[in-house]
Amino acid sequence: MKFVDEAAILVVAGDGGNGCVSFRREKYIPNGGPDGGDGGDGGDIYLLADENLNTLIDYRFVKSFRAERGQNGQSRDCTGKRGKDITIKVPVGTRVLDQGTGEIVGDMVRHGQRLMVAKGGFHGLGNSRFKSSVNRAPRQKTMGTEGETRELMLELLLLADVGMLGLPNAGKSTFIRAVSAAKPKVADYPFTTLIPSLGVVRMDYEQSFVIADIPGLIEGASDGAGLGIRFLKHLERCRVLLHLVDLAPIDESDPAENAKVIVNELQQYSENLAEKPRWLVFNKIDLIDPEEAEKRAKAIVETLGWEGKYYMISAANRDNVNALCWDVMSFLNSQPKAMAIAESVPEKVEFMWDDYHREQLAEVEAEAEDDWDDDWDEEDDDGVEIIYER
């Protein structure tokens, strides 16, 4: 299945149903009073995180989602039926952004997590809501409010403990094949990896971690060169980054300058990502003499001003790979997992449209008190029906 990590969708919640103007009329009850019911609320739209999904390709073809409208109120104080909600399933790790405001609506980081992205309209009130001691035959009603409309951008971010970055042909795919059961394509030309891939590294029966491999970066990636930096977002949730450096580039370029390119592109993309724990890993030591490998490694360390520990491995021959993985496992065990973004729990307040309806009711009562007179005739059918619109 094709990997798609971005999709734009339109969500339109259902409108609220209108209130009803009706009067009870039965045999021997010619003037039964108002019995118009309220409308139904409009349907809401939710996102649901599903661990069985791993791509957003479905939403490249179906881009619009509209919830059902609430039914109008009916006579005999019958309330209209509520509109049906819509639930949209997305992969775990999906970030939801509002394209209109640019705000992050939510992060779907847990299986079964549910997020409301569009609220349905509130129901209109029937004329039975407006009856009072001075207005016993009201012809007022309110209309249902419109449902919320939003244009959303869905971004899928891989959930991994360890992320790898480096130039094309640095050996990232070879490394992930060596330490996990993942089988990304490996070849001797740049950009063999076109989409991110995940692998599970099992150290023993109880300990394991997830590693992510993304397409390689080149100089100018932040300006759109190569595959650009669109895949760097998949490293945002990683707890540690492995910066792989090829000690024996096939184009005979300077490994120190190559390493510097990656650091610069990382800083241009995001300061937060550049500040994540990053380990320096020198790969392909099997292609050159040990002394030459050590010499090149020290030159890179000096160029970058690197003060931490560095590793020298051969992913193809699996030299020193197991020791690196155990060090990564120990580091992850010593670092607490990043707290998942807390779901915002709204304060318990009255619904936003309650104030609107309360104002309409108060307005009608005030008008009725001003216009009240003793000559009011209940059988007068010449009254005017009044509809309040928001």
Swiss-Prot record:
Enzyme class: hydrolase
Location(s) in or outside the cell: Cytoplasm
Keywords: Cytoplasm, GTP-binding, Hydrolase, Magnesium, Metal-binding, Nucleotide-binding
One protein family per Pfam: GTP1_OBG
Domain OBG-type G: 160-333
EC number(s) given by UniProt: 3.6.5.-
Magnesium in keyword set: yes
GO cellular component assignments: cytoplasm
InterPro entries attached to this UniProt entry: G_OBG, GTP-bd, GTP-bd_Obg/CgtA, GTP1-OBG_CS, GTP1_OBG_dom, GTP1_OBG_dom_sf, OBG_GTPase, P-loop_NTPase
Residues reported to bind Mg(2+): S173, T193
Record-linked PROSITE patterns: G_OBG, GTP1_OBG, OBG
Family of the protein in this entry: Belongs to the TRAFAC class OBG-HflX-like GTPase superfamily. OBG GTPase family.
Subunit and interaction comment: Monomer.
Functional description taken from the UniProt entry: An essential GTPase which binds GTP, GDP and possibly (p)ppGpp with moderate affinity, with high nucleotide exchange rates and a fairly low GTP hydrolysis rate. Plays a role in control of the cell cycle, stress response, ribosome biogenesis and in those bacteria that undergo differentiation, in morphogenesis control.
Protein's name according to its UniProt entry: GTPase Obg
